Amino acid sequence: MKKVYVLAAALAVALLVVSLSTSIIAALTPTPTFDEVRMSTLGSESTLLARDGEPLQRLRVDMTRRQLEWTALHAISPSLVRAVVAAEDHRFWWHFGFDPASGASAVMDQFGNGRGRGASTITMQLAGLITEGDRFGRRSVDEKLAQFRYAIALEHRWSKQQIIEAYLNLVPLRGELVGIRAASLGMFGHAPDALDEAEGAV
């Protein structure tokens, strides 16, 4: 019984240390708000309007990528959200921006066979996407630490729903397609809310 109390106390102390550490990191790491990111995300197309405000024509203004208007989370198929979380970061809804279990597994793989798996969570990937097109990417240790700090700060200031919504709108998916709306229309011919289980898995 004494061992149980000792383990419980140790766990409580560890959780307190983690909570304080992440709070300090978040306080020292500035990030934009969700609305700032959403409003500053520009699509690759521009709409030509008539004098009365009616749309006349859509023009492609960026030929390097195809990114359409921002899509709210409620307008994205839950099947797709589940598929992305399962494939990219299955503990997304529970971690604080960094997944210690995946990180430890990646380190073990690296030392075991030299082919380490990526340990970046969805929040860490979003941190890279927000900071000038994934400039953190697969870079130096210092840049990875910066990505780690940024992800923790995002988790403190944004909701999980905001994080997954921003990720799905900013992530490059296939070829020139950026964001879920461009990918859904380009690959399947319909909006993100109509994706079924099979399409979501793709």
Where are the language model's segments positioned?
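Juxtamembrane regions of bacterial inner-membrane/periplasmic proteins
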Residues: 1-202
